[in-house]
């Protein structure tokens, strides 16, 4: 089987509400839309594949151009089932400028389409092709607005097992108090995660982690900048609050470092930031070897 054609489409979808750093405060200059880049791959058989990537903020035009030009030339004519070899080929091509960043965002759409073709050619759902280990998976809800407790309880009744609360607007005490109120209102049976997207320094993160430890928060996600390996080591050594990291990581090597260091309980890879399912699976394999949980961020439909 060979790839014969790649076509793309660019959709710019208005957001229903501005991106937020907390339950109350929108980001300065917050993006008001999400850009989706769709890729359709055709083959010399009857099988075609669909993939997509997303951007919130700048870069969509660049990603679209990369897909249509360099990346299309790299993959058309290749066997779509050879996902590892194609990833290596693309990474080698981008070595002079680096694969992480917009190139990975662009290739993610192609890689997802490759897996779509591979599963269709095998005649099985993608989940089964990847092993089919879990018949079902728990899920949580995030970015709740309005009456957070009421809306959270409603979604829990519909099957959600937890709630993810974003913080980081600047008033640390006010947000800590809000987290406590939400956690106590939802009850012990509801899993609660607090996400900061790397907005705190180590001292503030340590204080919050101790506070969350006292009130029984289940996970503190990305409390300090992603590249601060030493900071995560110090934070993990001073708190029992489970830590998660990875929503801002742009390479699988970054995940390998934190997994091997043993500072976090959960890693949160973004399939688009990493460059697709192929690199995400490599992260999952290493995480399993070190008994670290994997909870992909965004694009749960993939």
Task: Enumerate the language-model features and the residues they cover.
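N-terminal capping/lid subdomain adjacent to the active-site entrance of alpha/beta enzymes
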Residues: 1-192, 197-199, 203-206, 210-214
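Flexible, glycine/charged-enriched surface loops at secondary-structure junctions
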Residues: 83, 125-129, 222-226, 297-298
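Active-site beta-loop-alpha junctions enriched in small/polar residues
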Residues: 142-144, 166-170, 195-201, 223-227, ...
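Conserved beta-strand positions in the central sheet of alpha/beta enzyme cores
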Residues: 162-164, 221, 268, 295
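Shared catalytic-loop signature of beta/alpha-barrel
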Residues: 210, 216, 227-302
